[in-house]
Amino acid sequence: MEGNTTFYATPTLNTVQNWRAATHDDFRFTFKLPKAITHEQMLRGCSEQLRDFMKVMEPLHDRVGQWTIQLPAAFGPEHLDRLKNFCASFPPNFPLGVEVRHMAFFSKGEEERALNQWLVENNIDRIIMDSRPVFAAKPNNEAIIDAQMKKPRVPVHAIATASHPLIRFIGHPEEQQNYEFFTP
């Protein structure tokens, strides 16, 4: 279950405790790190914010399958060292996933190879974004128009860089239309 709300605001401790109470021990969440860290500060000078966020989320740490570092399109290859330093602040084998949006990381060139190699070496998942279905939908209502304006249109690069690959599938509003995107 993706916890997208953490991207927009850090929940209260009470909310986190309610999420814990509402789930079984074998349930796994995927939480996004706050956009204040990933987008606004672009992983710079955010150690205190990260510490505060992780402290609030602590009651759920054993129920997190992956922590998502969703990066903005402006976060490119020139920032890779910053990503490396940021991820090094987590304990080894902490369940991290990185979602990139800069087109250089989809070019099959040296920048993408460097990213993927580093992710493999550090057991960090590269999150696969598949937004094709939402862009295949006719923009005939507000929700679709909004999604098409906000969601990234990046190539689908099916790659597993660690042991828990994750696909963010942004589906077509008509369920039947999604099936063609599941076929290789």
Model-derived features: positions:
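Residues lining hydrophobic/aromatic ligand-binding pockets adjacent to catalytic sites
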Residues: M1-P184
